[in-house]
Regions:
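Phosphate-binding and adjacent anionic-ligand microenvironments
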Residues: 292, 296-298, 320-322, 340-536, ...
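N-terminal small/polar loop signature for handling phosphorylated ligands or for N-terminal nucleophile
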Residues: 87-150, 250, 255-311
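Glycine-rich phosphate-binding loop plus the immediately following alpha-helix
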Residues: 156-186, 327-350, 355-364, 420
């Protein structure tokens, strides 16, 4: 069926509601808009769905959510998981509540129990709930930090991590088989509740999740000692972090927590920030204003589903607030956990630190200093969560900490996804420890640069939208693969890792070895002088991403090297 035929079917078929038909009638004269909405089925990738909210097969709406859920239901039934059920959470975005209910009722119509949170919750709490309730799967309705017009649908498996092989490919195949809405089941909510299939969850899971968060604290006595002295500014950016973040800080004893009023309440329109991403300085505009008013030590922002954390810290020497990348905040927490566990004699046997391949190389230096195994995985926190499962199954290592450059980390194994709630808690504890010793977080970061080396990292993206953009991204990756550069930013290319082909080619010796990681469309260039660069298409947005890192003899030297590498990459 052509895209125009599909458009006409959506406009006339009684299966579709009147609001959907009205929205589509309004674009009847816009051929390009019709094509963009109907030229493909919204792709169910290895993590789930993500797209612009609206009518059409290439949009997030109740029909594409039902279709994806029917595929998931078919797979769950094939695994005899209907009695275990599925936990479902959602964030503050437009249509999130409706999409969560549609997913639940589709599962219910297939005889599968759904445990649905009574209101918005952080993504990591859903990860926790899957394991706590013994569910076979989990769904969270969120588009993370994307702009307001987006929403998404992420799928988790029974270990509490986002789906990984073989389940990701198997679920994807089942979703692809659902080619007609005649195959999609649903039922009325009151019938599902009466049948005991639709179950509401809330406070009891919140309480258990909160207890697990607090268990990750290493020095609660330091927090209590410094509780009156450390000033924290926090913004949930209109998302799910407000209640759990404030609760954990309060229960640990922090007394001076200032929340940005303008961004405190959940709002899927994100009225104060067009891009609710804690990686973006614009997201901190209100928080930094408040920080200056109250003379805060630390400024924190969580994204709408509270799995990523952005950080600013006051540099007392200049009076200015310094931004921390996800690499920097992750390293501060990693160093603190490893140092204090070693000092207290609580480091487990065979400890492991897990990071993604595009995360800072400083992690390798820290792991080596504490005799901790460093394990690298593909981009995506689901692969870090998967490692915890492997450790438990194979009795090899004990997970101590995991992090990725994109502002996500996890202390503890109560959840299997990145958790900004625990990251806030740990970073505030690190800040308390620093203040007790007459330092700031920035001082602690400078100490780490001095100890391990001046590692600096960058990320640049090129956005290429639509059909032409997708083809252009594919063409660029093909060109990088066929004709790899010999030099980047003044650094020689020493080796090329092609994760799609599972090869690492040493350009000096010509030797070819395996990467040992799952197949993924990622190219990684090992450069001279401890520099590196990695390029890959985004899994959730129409972008190609360039990650890069250097090591310098000082901050100025490292930043100059980083600028040269960036300039060369973006030519």
């Amino acid at each position: 069926m052509s895209y125009m035929e599909t458009y006409k079917e959506w406009c006339t078929n009684p299966y579709f509601d009147e609001n959907t038909k009205a929205e589509l009638a309004a674009i009847g004269d816009d051929a390009a808009e019709i094509e963009d909405r109907f030229y493909r089925q919204l792709e169910f990738g290895t993590g789930g769905l993500r797209g612009v909210i609206g009518a059409g097969t290439n949009r997030m709406n109740i029909y594409t959510v039902r279709q994806a859920t029917q595929g998931l239901a078919n797979y769950i039934l094939s695994q005899n998981g209907q009695e275990k059920g599925v936990a479902i959470a959602h964030d503050s975005r437009i249509m999130s509540t409706e999409f969560a209910d549609e997913a639940a009722l589709c599962l219910n119509a297939n005889g599968i129990k759904a445990y649905v949170f009574d209101s918005l919750r952080p993504t990591p709490e859903l990860s926790f709930a899957v394991r706590e309730l013994g569910c076979i799967s989990g769904i969270v309705i969120t588009a993370s930090h994307n702009p307001r017009e987006y929403n998404g649908y992420k799928v988790y498996w029974e270990d509490g991590a986002q789906i990984t092989p073989p389940h990701d490919k198997n679920i994807l195949a089942e979703v692809a088989k659902v080619t007609s809405f005649d195959q999609v089941k649903t039922m009325k909510k009151e019938d599902a509740v009466a049948a005991g299939l639709y179950k509401v969850i809330g406070k009891e899971i919140d309480d258990r999740y909160m207890e697990e968060l607090k268990k990750q604290s290493i020095h609660p006595e330091v927090i209590k000692e410094m509780a009156k002295d450390i000033k924290i500014v926090y913004t949930p950016l209109h998302g799910t972090g407000n209640l759990p973040v404030r609760r954990v800080l309060k229960e640990l004893g922090f007394e001076q927590v200032y929340v940005v009023k303008e961004q405190e309440l959940p709002d899927g329109n994100f009225p104060t920030v067009s891009y609710p991403n804690p990686e973006s300085p614009k997201a901190f505009e209100f928080a930094l204003k408040l920080a200056k008013e109250v003379d805060a030590d630390i400024v924190l922002a969580t994204d709408p589903d509270a799995d990523r954390l952005g950080v600013y810290c006051k540099d007392t020497k200049t009076g200015e607030y310094v931004t921390f990348t996800g690499n920097m905040s992750g390293m501060l927490i990693a160093e603190y956990i490893l140092r204090e566990k070693k000092a207290m004699g609580t480091m487990p046997e065979n400890p492991a630190l897990v990071e993604t391949i595009v995360t800072t190389d400083m992690a390798k230096a820290i792991a080596a200093a504490y005799n901790v195994k460093l394990i690298e995985v593909l981009t995506g926190f689901k692969y870090i969560g998967e490692q915890i499962k492997f450790f438990e199954q194979q009795h090899t290592y004990h997970y101590v900490f995991g992090l990725e450059e994109s502002y996500g980390c996890l202390a503890g194994t109560y959840a299997r996804d990145k958790d900004a709630c625990v990251a806030v808690m740990m970073l505030c504890e690190v800040a308390s420890w620093c203040k007790k010793h007459g330092k700031t977080l920035w001082d602690a970061m400078l100490d780490m640069y001095e100890k391990y080396g001046y590692y600096r990292e960058g990320l640049e993206t090129k956005t290429l939208k639509g059909i032409d953009g997708a083809a252009q991204i594919q063409s660029m990756m093909s060109e990088y693969r066929t004709n790899p550069p010999k030099e980047l930013g003044g650094h020689r290319v020493l080796a090329v890792r092609d994760y799609k082909e599972d090869t690492r080619k040493d350009l000096v010796t010509g030797e070819v070895t395996k990467t040992g990681l799952p197949a993924s469309n990622v190219l990684y260039y090992e450069l001279s002088d401890n520099a590196w660069c990695c390029v890959r298409p985004s899994g959730t947005e129409p972008k190609i991403k360039y990650y890069f890192g250097v090591k310098g003899t000082s901050l100025a030297d490292a930043d100059a090297k980083l600028a040269a590498l960036k300039e060369d990459l973006l030519k």
